[in-house]
């Protein structure tokens, strides 16, 4: 996993946190709320993809580490 992807992931997470905070404030017009929601869905999809890729990488490095694999499972 390259540093470029890591920094992009961190930026996406921060933007997602900002979107959640803005939506939770309750002071957002409906149209803006829909825009933020859609952007949040895109960011969530990207972050979830990165996390799954990292999980697969970790499992490939040490596939016998059941404890480590369990921490990254969807259960």
UniProtKB/Swiss-Prot annotation:
It is found in: Cytoplasm. The keyword Hydrolase applies. It comes from the Bacteria. GO terms for biological process: DNA catabolic process. Its EC number is 3.1.11.6. It catalyses: Exonucleolytic cleavage in either 5'- to 3'- or 3'- to 5'-direction to yield nucleoside 5'-phosphates. GO terms for molecular function: exodeoxyribonuclease VII activity. InterPro entries: Exonuc_VII_S, Exonuc_VII_ssu_sf. Gene3D superfamilies: Exonuclease VII, small subunit. Keywords: Cytoplasm, Exonuclease, Hydrolase, Nuclease. GO terms for cellular component: cytosol; exodeoxyribonuclease VII complex. Its main location: cytoplasm. It is an enzyme of class 3 (hydrolase). Bidirectionally degrades single-stranded DNA into large acid-insoluble oligonucleotides, which are then degraded further into small acid-soluble oligonucleotides. Belongs to the XseB family. Heterooligomer composed of large and small subunits. This is Exodeoxyribonuclease 7 small subunit. It comes from Anaplasma phagocytophilum (strain HZ). The lineage of its organism: Bacteria, Pseudomonadati, Pseudomonadota, Alphaproteobacteria, Rickettsiales.
């Amino acid at each position: 996993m390259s540093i470029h992807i890591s920094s992009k992931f961190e930026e996406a997470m921060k933007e997602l946190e900002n979107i959640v905070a803005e939506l939770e404030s309750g002071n957002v017009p409906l149209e803006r709320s829909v825009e933020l929601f859609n952007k949040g869905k895109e960011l969530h999809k990207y972050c979830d993809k990165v996390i799954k890729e990292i999980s697969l990488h970790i499992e490939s490095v040490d596939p016998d580490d059941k404890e480590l694999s369990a921490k990254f499972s969807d259960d």
